[in-house]
Design a protein with these regions (language model features):
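A short acidic, glycine/proline-enriched capping/turn motif at secondary-structure boundaries
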Residues: 75, 84-86, 123-125
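Glycine-rich, proline-tolerant flexible connector loops at the mouths of alpha/beta enzymes
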Residues: 81-94
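N-terminal, well-ordered alpha-helical segments
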Residues: 60, 67-70, 100-103, 107
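Short secondary-structure transition/capping motifs
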Residues: 51-58, 91-98, 140
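Active-site region of glycoside hydrolase catalytic domains
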Residues: 1-46, 89-91, 99-445
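Catalytic domains of carbohydrate-active enzymes, especially glycoside hydrolases
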Residues: 61-82, 286-290
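Aromatic- and Gly/Pro-rich amphipathic surface segment
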Residues: 33-67
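A common structural microfeature
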Residues: 10-12, 59, 76
C-alpha cells in the first residue's frame, strides 16, 4: 500500500475545481454572460437540459468549501477566475464586485493555510467576445492579454502559482470543431483559427505574468491520453500517430518552440501553410515552470477511412471488455504512467504536475453516506503508477484530484459525479464520500 510520504516531503497535494462548474451566481453581482450560460440555454445541448444556474453555489459557500479542502488535508486549492465575472463584456469596464469576490476567496485560502493555484481560463469565454468570433478571431488575443494583466495586477501580490489555460485541446475540439461543447461551432474553418489563437494565448499570457509578478510559478495544463493502436497493422499505427499529434502534441509543441506537429497529419501541414504559423513560432513559445497534465483515460484507435478529418475511430473500453468508469472511460493506470513518461521525454519540460485526475461513478447517498469504493481503488491504482514514474527520475512535483465536490460536468450536466464530496443539487448540502475520508487518511499518514 502506497503512502503520501512515499512521494517525498516536498510533494504537493491538491484538489481542483473550475468557476463555471461550481460558482453559480451566473447572472448576479455584475457578472456577464459566458458562452456556457448561453449554451446551456439551448435545448438539447446538455443532458436532461440541465442549466448552470446555481451550480454548487460556491460563490456564496466558498468559506464552507475551503474548510472542506482543509479538513480533507489538501495543501492546494485550484480554482479558476471567471473572465465574464471580471470583465462582463470581455474587455473594457471592470466589475469591481467580481474583483472583490476573488480577493475574498484568495484571502480565505491563505487564512486556512491553503495555497491557491489560479487558472486564468477554464472555458467560460464572455459571450460578448464570442459574438465577435471568440477564439476564431485574432482580436481575442488582445482581449485575453488585457484580462491576464488585470488579474496579475490585482492578485499577483498574494498568488504566486498560475495556470494559463485549462485543456486547450478540449475547448477547441469540442467547442469549435465538433460542436458538442460551448460555443457549439463545427468544422476545421473554426477549429484551426481557434487552435492558432489559443497557442498564442498560452505563451503571451505566460509572458505577461512573468513581467508583472515577481517569483511567479507559471504553468498551463494539457489533457493527455496514451493513444494505443487497436492492431499493429500499418493503417492502425498511422491512425494512432495522427490522433496523438492532435490530442497530445498540438499545443505543447508550439509552447516548447517546436511549432505544430505536422509530420504525422497532413491536414496540420496544410493548416501551417495556409496560416503561415511558422512565422509565429517565437510568439507561441514560452518557458513554463511546470506543465500540468490531466489524464482520465487512454484511447484505443483503429483506422476508419469514413471518419472525416482524422480517419480514425475509437474502440470503446466496453466493447473490449475493459474496466471503465460511469463515463465509459477505460481504467488503465499503466497508460497513465506511459503518458506521463511521454510528456516528460520532451527536453524542455522541467517539471510536471498532475493538475487533474479522477473518476465518475454512479454515487448514491444512502443513509447519509456515499460508499464509493471503486473511486478509492481508482486513486490507489493511479497514484501507484505515478509513484513508479517519479521513482524512475521524472520530476513530478504534485498531484491534484478532480474534484472537490460533484458539480456541473459540461455536456453531462449534473449527472456525472466526480467529487470527493457529494453535492445534493436540490439542497446544496455537502457530504464527504468515503473517498474523501480515504484522502484524509492518506494525507494524514
Amino acid at each position: 500500500m502506497i503512502k503520501a510520504s512515499d512521494f517525498g516531503p516536498d510533494f504537493l497535494w491538491g484538489v481542483a475545481t473550475a468557476a463555471p462548474q461550481i460558482e453559480g451566481a451566473a447572472d448576479l453581482y455584475g457578472k456577464g454572460t459566458s458562452i456556457w450560460d448561453s449554451f446551456t440555454n439551448r435545448k438539447g445541448k446538455i443532458k436532461n437540459n440541465h442549466k448552470l444556474g446555481v451550480a454548487c453555489d460556491f460563490y456564496h459557500r466558498y468559506q464552507e468549501d475551503i474548510a472542506l479542502v482543509k479538513l480533507l488535508g489538501f495543501q492546494i486549492f485550484r480554482f479558476s477566475i471567471s473572465w465574464p465575472r471580471i470583465l462582463p463584456l470581455g474587455r473594457g469596464e471592470v466589475n469591481q464586485e467580481g474583483i472583490r469576490f476573488y480577493h475574498h476567496l484568495i484571502n480565505e485560502c491563505l487564512t486556512q493555510g491553503i495555497t491557491p493555484y489560479v487558472t486564468l481560463y477554464h472555458w467560460d469565454l464572455p459571450q460578448a467576445l464570442e459574438d465577435e468570433g471568440g477564439w476564431t478571431s485574432f482580436s481575442i488575443n488582445a482581449a485575453f492579454n488585457a484580462f491576464v494583466s488585470i488579474c496579475a495586477l490585482e492578485y499577483g501580490d498574494k498568488v504566486k502559482n498560475w495556470i494559463i489555460l485549462n485543456e486547450p485541446f478540449g475547448y477547441t475540439s469540442l467547442g469549435y470543431m465538433l460542436g458538442i461543447h460551448a460555443p457549439g461551432k463545427t468544422g476545421l474553418s473554426n477549429f484551426f483559427p481557434a487552435v492558432l489563437h489559443t497557442a498564442l494565448a498560452q505563451a503571451e499570457g505566460g509572458k505577461i505574468l512573468r513581467a508583472e509578478i515577481s517569483q511567479a510559478n507559471i504553468g498551463t495544463t494539457y489533457s493527455c491520453s496514451e493513444i494505443i493502436p487497436y492492431t499493429q497493422s500499418e493503417n492502425d499505427l498511422l491512425a494512432a500517430k495522427r490522433v496523438d499529434s492532435l490530442m497530445n502534441r498540438l499545443f505543447i509543441e508550439p509552447a516548447l518552440g517546436l511549432g505544430f506537429p505536422t509530420a504525422d497529419w497532413d491536414l496540420l501541414e496544410k493548416f501551417q501553410i495556409e496560416y503561415g504559423t511558422w512565422r509565429l513560432n517565437d510568439r507561441m513559445k514560452f518557458d513554463f515552470d511546470f506543465i500540468g497534465l490531466q489524464n482520465y483515460f487512454p484511447l484505443t484507435v483503429k483506422f476508419n477511412a469514413f471518419i472525416p478529418v482524422i480517419q480514425a475511430w475509437e474502440v470503446k473500453a466496453k466493447s473490449r471488455k475493459k474496466p471503465h468508469t460511469a463515463m465509459g472511460w477505460e481504467i488503465n493506470a499503466n497508460s497513465f504512467y506511459n503518458i506521463v513518461k511521454q510528456f516528460a521525454a520532451y527536453p524542455n519540460v522541467k517539471n510536471i504536475m498532475i493538475t487533474e485526475n479522477g473518476a465518475a461513478y454512479h454515487d448514491k447517498l444512502i443513509e447519509g453516506s456515499v460508499v464509493d469504493a471503486e473511486r478509492i481503488e481508482y486513486f490507489e491504482l493511479y497514484l501507484a503508477a505515478l509513484l513508479k514514474a517519479k521513482n524512475e527520475g521524472i520530476n513530478i512535483s504534485g498531484y491534484m484530484a478532480w474534484t472537490l465536490m460533484d458539480n456541473f460536468e459540461w455536456a453531462e450536466g449534473f449527472n456525472a459525479r466526480f467529487g470527493l464530496v457529494h453535492t445534493d443539487f436540490k439542497t446544496l448540502k455537502r457530504t464527504i464520500k468515503y473517498s474523501g475520508y480515504w484522502w484524509q487518511e492518506f494525507l494524514r499518514n
